[in-house]
């Protein structure tokens, strides 16, 4: 059991156990000792559902990363390839199998595709002459991975690019399959709302899948009241802005991968007595797991960074007072009680030390002049100031050859806040970028245009002010310490995606029909009839539970905003978040960048 998955209204341990059971059953089918050959990308997501101890219990003795040529020597009966259905991986597998066949004693080969088998991949293995070598060729439907008690992700890094650039619906199919799995475990979701073309496709796929499985009536009592499917391209603006929550900033600066972050080690080195000892500083990055299993992290992760310092200093006083209690312990009983609390207190002290170090690292960035200048420009754009002309700060960034990703984020943000740039402004930016960073980046600029992130304003009309005012996307007075509105996550800007979720809950989307028509893609509502006997009756005062599924990625700041809404006393709705990928502005744009040869 992973305790942090079961704290919310929806116990996500049920899903984790279901996918673990499926994995155990496959491993047991391959009788005898085993080696797993991993597609490297899958090791992170797998770590969230099955640690090495589980694999070991089922006779997994060796683990290797999939590479071309020969496998390392392993005295095992079974070799299992655990891979995504990608053609380039099939070429490596074929090399491995052929070199093993030449090596001597025969092994049993198996392949487990995650999350689906692919006819194309099996054909490639056949063309390479190794398809017949596999005893089991199966799929492991790991569509949605539980990250936290209210958070699920498919961790499909190319989903946005596939959907919006390549017209490939594979990830939408996986999303629909994942939602069908959730409904099998947690009951039919009575109402589906959606906004966007991809949302419409996923809803259609779900209806079709449900028709195909009419034989089995779902008699599980529904846990979710609503499903909201949101296309990322309905709100392209939000991920481009700099996140200002604690967790969002950790991701922006260091990158959080599968709940882990790697940090500069020198901040975490134990303090030496008498100074000196600099040459003994650790050189390996400090790796920390970040989820709500850690009490302090759960408390500060969603706060605006400016509110984190006061929480940490308050915690320091409480912990220090708790340790002082040992001087007051006089009787054997009191000493015993203090000793029993010691492990928890020491863990709390370690946690505080880690987060104090992380906060210092972040503060070094957020107090820099460049961070302030960049944030000022972003906030001017989002509040509607000077969005229609070439920006001096962006010009300076290009002239000083700042990282290209930073420049692209700012230019795309300006484009989104002006419903596209004037043609001459767009041409100027493109020319400056290509001359400074290299003409090979023309492919990246084309991708950004195709995705709608960078565009020329058509018809001379800027719709952003209408959207901003109607949805209250910009708030001048933000209380970062004790927020009253979701705009605290960006210190003034309320994420459009989350505002849509909030307005759907109350008073409903009819109140914003005009804006919904301006935003891309259709908006719709579907009802799913519930089997008799499992109709949901809410208790007085009981909140609705809404699953918000972001198709194309979600940021930690948006997650924080939805958690804020869940905690409102009179909010009426608790949110569970699902997504194709956890993203920040840089990782999102990098997935759209064409790598120069």
UniProtKB/Swiss-Prot annotation:
Q: Where in the cell is it found?
A: Cytoplasmic vesicle; Late endosome membrane; Lysosome membrane; Early endosome
User: What InterPro entries does this protein map onto?
Assistant: Sec-1-like_dom1 (IPR043154), Sec1-like (IPR001619), Sec1-like_dom2 (IPR027482), Sec1-like_sf (IPR036045), VPS33_dom3b (IPR043155)
Which keywords does the record carry? Cytoplasmic vesicle, Endosome, Lysosome, Membrane, Protein transport, Transport
- Gene3D superfamilies named among the record's database cross-references: 1.25.40.850, 3.40.50.1910, 3.40.50.2060
Q: In which tissues is it expressed?
A: Ubiquitous.
Q: How does it sit in the membrane?
A: Peripheral membrane protein
Q: Which GO terms describe its molecular function?
A: protein-containing complex binding
Please give the GO cellular component terms listed in this UniProt entry: AP-3 adaptor complex; autophagosome; clathrin complex; clathrin-coated vesicle; CORVET complex; early endosome; HOPS complex; late endosome
Biological process (GO) annotations? autophagosome maturation; endosome to lysosome transport; intracellular protein transport; lysosome localization; melanosome localization; pigmentation; platelet formation; regulation of developmental pigmentation
The portions of this protein that span the membrane are: none
> What does this protein do, in the record's words?
Plays a role in vesicle-mediated protein trafficking to lysosomal compartments including the endocytic membrane transport and autophagic pathways. Believed to act as a core component of the putative HOPS and CORVET endosomal tethering complexes which are proposed to be involved in the Rab5-to-Rab7 endosome conversion probably implicating MON1A/B, and via binding SNAREs and SNARE complexes to mediate tethering and docking events during SNARE-mediated membrane fusion.
Q: What family does the Swiss-Prot or TrEMBL record give for this protein?
A: Belongs to the STXBP/unc-18/SEC1 family.
List the protein's name. Vacuolar protein sorting-associated protein 33A
Q: Which organism is it from?
A: Rattus norvegicus
Q: What is the lineage of its organism?
A: Eukaryota, Metazoa, Chordata, Craniata, Vertebrata
